[in-house]
Design a protein with these regions (language model features):
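Acidic, turn/loop-rich segments in luminal/extracellular domains of secretory-pathway
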Residues: 1-11, 59-128, 137-165, 169-172
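Long alpha-helical scaffolds
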Residues: 11, 15-18, 50, 116, ...
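Short, solvent-exposed loop/edge segments of extracellular or virion-exposed proteins
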Residues: 16-29, 54-57, 129-142
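Short, structured coil/turn linkers that connect adjacent secondary-structure elements
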Residues: 19, 39-40
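A short beta-strand segment in extracellular, disulfide-stabilized domains
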Residues: 30-37, 144-150
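Short, tryptophan-glycine- and acidic/Ser/Thr-enriched carbohydrate-recognition patches
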Residues: 42-48
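Flexible "stalk/tail and boundary" regions
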Residues: 49-62
């Protein structure tokens, strides 16, 4: 005997895949990009968006440990380093990066979501030293050896004084 069987296949919405991201940023230069278009996918081809971010909401700045992070609903982001942060100021070339993380939720717009973590690696920069104006008085025809303290040298990075250039001297 012969049987006829009908099978109905109903498509279901599959969850998107939100992949972890790493952002490398240097103090003084904001980092920008897009966490959704860089590596997140949806098996159904749905357009993905950021529906949530831990500690805030899409489009609103979040103050992190080392800077401010803004993640918009389209996945675009900006991370700006807080150049007044003591750890950022103290960062030296060769030090490991300062790291903080943010977790976001990607949505396919049809009820399915997935989460991923954004790791931000912050590197400082070599900041210029400062010097304070100073007057040094010495007797005529007498040698004077300048000391570092007479130049009011200061460096937030902790670097030592390398050299000094005297550009003008008073005339008699």
């Amino acid at each position: 005997s012969t049987y006829t069987m009908t099978i109905d296949v109903t498509a279901v919405n599959d969850a998107p895949t939100a992949n972890d991201d790493t952002i490398n940023v240097v103090s003084g230069t904001p980092a920008t990009g897009n966490v959704v278009t860089s590596n997140d996918t949806d098996p159904d081809g749905d357009t993905l968006s950021v529906s949530a971010i831990a500690g805030g909401s899409p489009g609103s700045p979040i103050t992190g440990t080392y800077g401010t992070f803004t993640l918009d609903s389209d996945g675009s982001y900006t991370y700006t380093v807080d150049t007044s942060n003591a750890d950022v100021i103290a960062w030296q070339s060769g030090d490991p990066p300062l790291t903080e993380t943010f977790t976001y939720t990607a949505s396919d717009g049809n009820g399915e979501t997935n989460t991923a973590t954004i790791t931000v690696n912050v590197s400082g920069s070599n900041d210029a030293p400062t010097a304070a104006d100073n007057t040094v008085t010495t007797n005529e025809d007498t040698d004077h050896t300048f000391s570092e303290s007479e130049f009011g040298f200061s460096d937030v990075d902790g670097d030592s004084l390398d050299h000094v250039s005297i550009e003008t001297l008073p005339s008699n």
